[in-house]
Amino acid sequence: MKIRPLHDRVIIKRIEAEAKSAGGIVLTGTAAQKSTRGEVLAVGTGRILDNGDVKALAVKVGDKVIFNEGYGVKTEKLDGQDVLILSETDILAIVEE
């Protein structure tokens, strides 16, 4: 199945954080936090401005990002894998390696 996001929406695959503490203790269950990093899988056409123009998104497919997992984030299954659908405004930063 393919999903094509609309407007300023972005589809992200979560990059799982390592489940170890700084001291090397393996974290399980509720002790392990969900990662707020992900890889952009698809982007919409852009944000529609008040004057009707469309502004292209700052992120592109393949970007590694840090996002805010808040109220507007939707989780969906895509080919057996959980993906997140969120607005570009929920993306806090692009990780440059």
Curated annotation (Swiss-Prot):
Molecular-function annotations in GO: ATP binding; metal ion binding; protein folding chaperone; protein-folding chaperone binding; unfolded protein binding
Predominant location category: cytoplasm
Pfam families with a match to the protein in the record: Cpn10
NCBIfam families, alphabetized: PRK00364.1-1, PRK00364.1-2, PRK00364.2-2
Name of the protein described by the UniProt record: Co-chaperonin GroES
Annotated GO CC locations: cytoplasm
Keyword Iron assigned: no
Keyword terms, alphabetized: Chaperone, Cytoplasm
